Amino acid sequence: DWGRLMIREYLPEKLQSNTIILYFHGGGYVVSSVNTHDAWVKLLSSHLKARVFSLEYRLAPENKFPLALEDANSAIEWISKENNIPISEISLCGDSAGGHLAASLSTYRSLNNFELPHSQCLIYPMTDPLCNSKSQVEFSKGFFLGQNFMIWFWKQLMASDNNHADPTFNLTIDPDAALPKTL
């Protein structure tokens, strides 16, 4: 159902690339939007001289996992169809929750034997819903996004505790997924 997706397209003044990027905004899956990331995505499109599409995916806590992932998958398929290009020519990019969503989409497509995107650029992605990695514990206090705050964001997204075992949700699980080139 592509009719429910809101996707904003960015075209640079001088398009010098056939590259198409699908961008996912950050915000812990709870806050932010295409609008909050508008200036950043314009800058990205301008500097790369490439077309960028920014997706307004459904936010938690009203919309639990995997609804944002479903939105992302619908978006990449729509962009592919509308531009008559294979998904393998579309790159993904996202920051924070958006970085998680990009990696989650690549993992989902790999595990289901769907065509993979060309590449993914993950900017400080959320990866560990358990929030118990060495660095997460070591830097759990004294920073804006400390361990307790991150746990809160993950809990807003989780439909159940079973999400921890889902490799499209918990990116610290090594599922033998073949992933695209990653930066």
Regions found by a protein language model. Name each.
Residues 2-183:
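Alpha/beta-hydrolase superfamily serine-hydrolase fold, recognizing
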